[in-house]
């Protein structure tokens, strides 16, 4: 038996129908379409507005489309991993809820938490599981209902985020020179003061005080986060290129975390990679946290060709960051959205 490689064999995605555009936001807070577009590059974002629906709904819709597209037998799935910052509940895991709704009879499921870096980290975990030889098919889902954490009276953060989910099927293959090649993943651990949600965890449990003082919303010091994101992501991209002896001309695609268009532009410029090789969809989805990378992959799938050199990179709360080098395993044009 040859070396086992872990390859993505299909991509699914889902975004809610409701579109919250900049014009509507300008009626909610003191902002303008021009200000938002210039600062972060976002024109609109999707919001899950139906009551009683959470992240598991988004994840299930993306996974269901993935299963239908690939034609994979659900009974052959070994594991399902959901990476999210906005789980339905503290427990049980969102992944277990998704698994139950999909009717996966022979799989186990668990959640993974790495904020906006979640998909990058989880793809590496799934690849390692596949390469161990113990598992053959794993569904990885990045999903977030960021609207549940956003304070729509805070113009600094409410313009940034949207809801969505992306899913990939990761399978085992003995084909050479395809799939996840290697990763460079890092955690700073000093980022807590700059990006967090103050209440709701074991340090500061929910109470009348935390609700009254609006402590259950996302808190971010934007300028500091921007600076760290640009520095870390650009260094990570250059490191993964160095590890694999890649020049800028060798890179076909960069799939970045879609947090801010200016961050994406700065990162790729530092790495010497032209913007036309970068998948950018932040203008119409906003920052969907763990969902940004798989949603970008979903949008770009039809353009990807077998053998393409793809670099994933992301940055999130913690701070967590990294990059991975992936050789695409199929012609994406064969699949439609």
Predicted regions and their residues:
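Condensing-enzyme catalytic core mediating Claisen C-C bond formation in acyl metabolism
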Residues: 1-50, 154-227, 231, 235, ...
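Glycine/charged-rich beta-loop-alpha catalytic/anionic-binding loops adjacent to active sites
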Residues: 42-44, 76-81, 100-113, 149-153, ...
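Flexible, glycine-rich active-site loops centered on histidine and acidic residues
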Residues: 131-165
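Acidic-glycine-rich active-site phosphate/pyrophosphate-binding loop
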Residues: 29-38, 89-103, 139-146, 202-210, ...
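Short beta-strand segments
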Residues: 9, 83, 113, 138-144, ...
């Amino acid at each position: 038996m040859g070396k086992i490689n872990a390859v993505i064999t299909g991509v699914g995605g889902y975004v809610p129908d409701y579109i919250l555009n900049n014009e509507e936001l300008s009626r909610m807070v003191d902002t303008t379409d021009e200000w938002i577009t210039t600062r972060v590059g976002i024109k609109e974002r999707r919001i899950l507005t139906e009551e009683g629906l959470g992240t598991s709904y988004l994840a299930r819709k993306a996974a269901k489309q993935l299963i239908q597209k690939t034609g994979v037998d659900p009974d052959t799935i070994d594991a399902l991993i959901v990476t999210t910052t906005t789980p339905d509940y503290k427990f049980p895991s969102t992944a277990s809820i998704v698994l139950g709704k999909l009717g996966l009879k022979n799989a186990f499921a668990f959640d993974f938490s790495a904020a906006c870096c979640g998909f990058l980290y989880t793809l590496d975990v799934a690849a390692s599981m596949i390469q161990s030889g113990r598992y053959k098919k794993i569904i990885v889902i990045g999903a977030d209902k960021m609207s549940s954490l956003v304070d729509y009276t805070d113009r600094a953060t409410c313009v940034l985020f949207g809801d969505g989910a992306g899913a990939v099927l990761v399978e085992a293959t003995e084909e050479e020179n395809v799939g996840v090649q290697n990763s460079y993943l890092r955690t700073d651990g000093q980022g807590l003061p700059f990006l967090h949600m103050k209440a709701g965890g074991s340090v500061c449990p929910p109470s009348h005080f935390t609700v009254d003082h609006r402590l259950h919303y996302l808190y971010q010091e934007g300028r500091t986060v921007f600076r760290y994101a640009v520095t870390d992501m650009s260094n990570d991209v250059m490191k993964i290129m160095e590890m694999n002896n890649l020049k800028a001309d060798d890179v076909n695609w960069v799939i970045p975390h879609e947090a801010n268009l200016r961050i994406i532009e700065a990162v790729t410029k530092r790495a010497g990679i032209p913007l036309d090789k970068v998948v950018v969809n932040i203008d119409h989805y906003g920052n969907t946290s763990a969902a940004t990378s798989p949603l970008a992959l979903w949008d770009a799938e039809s353009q990807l060709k077998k053998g393409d050199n793809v670099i994933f990179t992301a940055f999130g709360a913690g701070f967590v960051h990294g990059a991975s080098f992936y050789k695409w395993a199929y012609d994406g044009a064969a699949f439609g959205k």
